[in-house]
Amino acid sequence: MIARLLSAPMLIAAFAILVGTCVDALVKGVAPGAGLHHLLAWRFLFGALLSLAVFLALRKPVPGWEAVRFHTLRGLLQLFCAFTFFYALTQLPLAVATTLGFTAALLVAPVARLLLGEKISPIAAGATLLGFAGVAFALSGQSGAGDGAGNQTLGLISLFSSTIGYAFVLVLLRMRALIEDATTIALFTNIVPALAMLPVTFGLFGAPDGRDLPVFALLGLLGYGVWYLATLAYGRAPAQRLAPLEYTSLVWSALLGLVFFDEMPGWQLWVGAVVIIAACLIVAFEGRFRTRREARLPASDLPE
């Protein structure tokens, strides 16, 4: 049964997205009372302990110094993305944060151009502009969030900072995913932020409420699971097959926001989300269609 599930990468990816959305909802509910710094420190500590245990149990080889330096940079960037995104979750409706988070996919092309020298096609550039037009329309229906308009402004600044950082994380991950396994990548994703947050863990900024520790442990478990499952799925199927599944998180976030936080997204958000998703799909599939055109193949593998 387990082998059959592991052979279904789309199912693995879909489940990872559902779990990730549940993590976002849990953070939104817990962070204001527990303290975001405590949540991050202990979430990554528990995630690091779990990922290290799996790494040792599977007897994975220790990466070389070059890989360690690379993953240290990526791990610190991951911590920045987690902090800014989690803060945004406390200030914005869950569905809004999820929708605007999709823009990270639109920023991958410019980041890949910067880091890898990849050329940005006119179609990708146009799709990026279309996506941010969708962002503007989605925000047009927002009258405020959190405790006031100031909180919404800070939330949006924090969220877009997170998406820019996450675009860098995705490109960096792509540079290593072909030569390293999911276990090693998941280990550094957790252990580097955990080490960086040790001053908080050791109580230099106050002690957390002991009743919150089980929740932090759950976040560490779920956070590790999301990264491991996602890396596992993307190692078994082309990214273009799995990428559209990312947008199912909007449905889950809207449902969880309504049930647990009494958040009802306006119609502008849904229209803007459709525009953003369409732009992301154009970016995701444009390279495939261009390659098939150059090879004089049909645009689709479906029978005509």
Placement of each model-derived feature along the sequence:
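Membrane-interface helix-cap regions at the ends of transmembrane helices
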Residues: A48-A67, V135-G148, V192-D212, L218, ...
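Transmembrane alpha-helices of multi-pass small-molecule transport proteins
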Residues: P9-I12, G33-F80, L130, G165-V169, ...
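C-terminal transmembrane-helix exit sites in multi-pass transporters
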Residues: A104-L129, V251-W270
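Hydrophobic transmembrane alpha-helices of multi-pass small-molecule transport proteins
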Residues: I123-Q142, Q268-G287
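Transmembrane alpha-helical segments that form core, pore/gating elements
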Residues: S51, A145-F205, E294-E304
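Helix-helix packing/entry segments at the starts of transmembrane helices
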Residues: A97-T103, R176-V192, W227-L258
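Cytoplasmic-side transmembrane-helix entry/capping segments in multi-pass membrane proteins
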Residues: P9-A14, E66-L76, I120-A133, G155-L156, ...
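Loop-to-transmembrane-helix transition segments
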Residues: S7-A16, F55, K60-T84, T153-S162, ...
